[in-house]
């Protein structure tokens, strides 16, 4: 809440605190729709992390529709359920968040291609400061973000953080090694990388590998392999 801010002068509030107060003032008007146009654009990373959890609570606890305008893939991944992407004034993609990201959201480019998976926290380890998030039939070990067991959680996995192997890796530091099958493969002649769409335990993830690796491993649609998720994070 903002109760502890009520007696503070506006000049003494941080950027994140000012945004929270502005949102609270808007909510006091009992709106039928909340429109936020780049609300975090002027904030640094730390201030964004201060206010994003608050926006998530608004999304989850209020019955008021929220229309959120942003150029940030991270903000979209954390807050959106349905996405409409514009480019030069035209709609170029729309639909559920997971589908739009999977089909290559125009704003993220190949380097930033990613998927968002919705799951539930099923384990937490105080010893290792990790948590297990189960999405579909797949369990992902990730850094603990403070969510309680049973809480819903979203995972974002970048394509560049997923490598593949034809045989099950042994003695590896990578904690998330998933049996998978290639269900899609795309690339452009003359480019050095290809994008694989993988099905792993009811989840679809992307893997960006070099064209040479794909050729030498004989990877094609239908190839069974192991996806090595080098990094996954609760968002």
What role is predicted for each listed range?
Residues 9-13, 17:
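Conserved ABC ATPase signature
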Residues 56, 60, 70-136:
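Internal alpha/beta loop-helix hairpins
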Residues 1-5, 56-57:
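Conserved ABC ATPase "signature" region
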Residues 139-186, 204, 208-235:
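Glycine/charge-rich catalytic "coupling/switch" loops of P-loop NTPases
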Residues 23:
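Hydrophobic anchor residue at the start of the ABC signature
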Residues 34-38:
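Catalytic Walker B motif of ABC-type/P-loop ATPase nucleotide-binding domains
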Residues 28-32:
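A short, proline-enriched helix->beta-strand linker immediately N-terminal to the Walker B motif
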């Amino acid at each position: 809440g903002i109760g502890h801010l009520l007696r503070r002068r506006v000049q003494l509030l941080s950027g994140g605190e000012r945004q929270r107060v502005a949102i609270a003032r808007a909510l006091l008007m009992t709106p039928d729709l909340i429109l936020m146009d780049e609300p975090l654009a002027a904030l640094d990373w730390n201030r964004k992390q201060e206010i994003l959890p608050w926006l998530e609570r608004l999304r989850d606890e209020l019955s008021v529709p929220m229309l959120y305008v942003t150029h940030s893939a991270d903000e979209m991944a954390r807050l959106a359920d349905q996405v409409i992407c514009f480019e030069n004034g035209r709609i170029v993609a729309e639909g559920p968040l997971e589908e739009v990201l999977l089909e290559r959201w125009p704003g993220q480019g190949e380097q930033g291609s990613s998927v968002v998976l919705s799951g539930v926290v099923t384990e937490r380890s105080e010893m290792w400061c990790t948590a297990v998030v189960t999405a579909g039939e797949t369990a992902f070990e990730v850094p603990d973000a403070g969510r309680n067991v049973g809480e819903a959680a979203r995972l974002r996995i970048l394509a560049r953080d997923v490598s593949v192997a034809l045989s099950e890796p042994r003695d590896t530091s990578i904690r998330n090694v998933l049996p998978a099958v290639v269900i899609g493969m795309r690339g452009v002649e003359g480019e050095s990388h290809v994008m694989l769409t993988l099905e792993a335990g009811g989840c679809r993830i992307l893997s960006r590998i070099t064209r040479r690796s794909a050729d030498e491993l004989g990877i094609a649609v239908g190839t069974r392999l192991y996806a090595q998720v080098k990094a996954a994070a609760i968002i």
